[in-house]
Amino acid sequence: MNLIPTVIESTNRGERAYDIYSRLLKDRIIMLGSAIDDNVANSIVSQLLFLQAQDAEKDIYLYINSPGGSVTAGMAIYDTMQHIKPDVQTICIGMAASMGSFLLAAGAKGKRFALPNAEVMIHQPLGGAQGQATEIEIAARHILKTREKLNRILAERTGQPIEKIEKDTDRDNFLTADEAKAYGLIDEVMHPAE
C-alpha cells in the first residue's frame, strides 16, 4: 500500500490540507522517488513547466532517489531541464541509478549534490529485442545509437573523456557520493550544518 502523507497548513483563511508532494512543490521541490516511466516523466515535466511559469528566475530543486527506468521517459525530463529558464538543482538521496544518475548529472553546473551516504550507479542502456533477424538488427542499431548519445552527454556533463565514459558504463559501476563528485557527476557532497 502506498500512503501519501497529508500536511495541514494554517493560513489567515483557515486550515488547508495538502498531500506532501503538493506542499513541497510550493517550495519549488520536486521528488523523483521511483522508477522512471512515461507517467512519472509526464508528472516531473509538468511540475518543471509549472514552476517555470510561476517564477522563471528562482531555482527548482529535484530530489532523486530512483533506480532509473525508461530512456525515452528520462530524456523527456532531461530535455525539459535543459529547456526551461530556471536552474534545476539536483540532489541525490539514497540511490540515483541508471537514468536516475543521468538526471542527477543533468542539474545546473555547480548545483548538483548528493547526501553523504547516497550511491550513484552508471551503466549502458538496457534493451531487448525479439522478432525476425532484421527487426533485431534494427533494435540493436537503435540501442547502440542511444548508448552513444547518452555517453556523449555524460562526457559533456562530467568533463570525462568519452573513452572513459564508454569503459566505465560498460557494466554497472557503483560510486559513493565522494566518488561521484570526483567523477564529475555531482559538484558537492552535502554535509549536515555544523
UniProtKB/Swiss-Prot annotation:
Sorted UniProt keywords: Cytoplasm, Hydrolase, Protease, Serine protease
Entries under InterPro entries matching the protein: ClpP, ClpP/crotonase-like_dom_sf, ClpP/TepA, ClpP_His_AS, ClpP_Ser_AS
Active site (UniProt): S98 (nucleophile), H123
GO CC, alphabetical: cytoplasm; endopeptidase Clp complex
Cysteines paired by S-S bonds: none
Keyword presence, Hydrolase: yes
Catalytic reaction equation(s): Hydrolysis of proteins to small peptides in the presence of ATP and magnesium. alpha-casein is the usual test substrate. In the absence of ATP, only oligopeptides shorter than five residues are hydrolyzed (such as succinyl-Leu-Tyr-|-NHMec, and Leu-Tyr-Leu-|-Tyr-Trp, in which cleavage of the -Tyr-|-Leu- and -Tyr-|-Trp bonds also occurs)
EC number: 3.4.21.92
Any Pfam family matching the protein: CLP_protease
Any one Gene Ontology BP term: protein quality control for misfolded or incompletely synthesized proteins
SUPFAM superfamilies assigned to the protein according to its UniProt record, in alphabetical order: ClpP/crotonase (SSF52096)
CDD domains: S14_ClpP_2
GO terms assigned for molecular function: ATP-dependent peptidase activity; ATPase binding; serine-type endopeptidase activity
Protein origin, superkingdom: Bacteria
Subcellular compartments: Cytoplasm
Family assignment from sequence similarity: Belongs to the peptidase S14 family.
Function: Cleaves peptides in various proteins in a process that requires ATP hydrolysis. Has a chymotrypsin-like activity. Plays a major role in the degradation of misfolded proteins.
Complex formation: Fourteen ClpP subunits assemble into 2 heptameric rings which stack back to back to give a disk-like structure with a central cavity, resembling the structure of eukaryotic proteasomes.
PANTHER family: ATP-DEPENDENT CLP PROTEASE PROTEOLYTIC SUBUNIT (PTHR10381:SF70)
NCBIfam families: clpP (TIGR00493), PRK00277.1 (NF001368), PRK12553.1 (NF009205)
Protein name (Swiss-Prot/TrEMBL): ATP-dependent Clp protease proteolytic subunit
Gene name, Swiss-Prot/TrEMBL: clpP
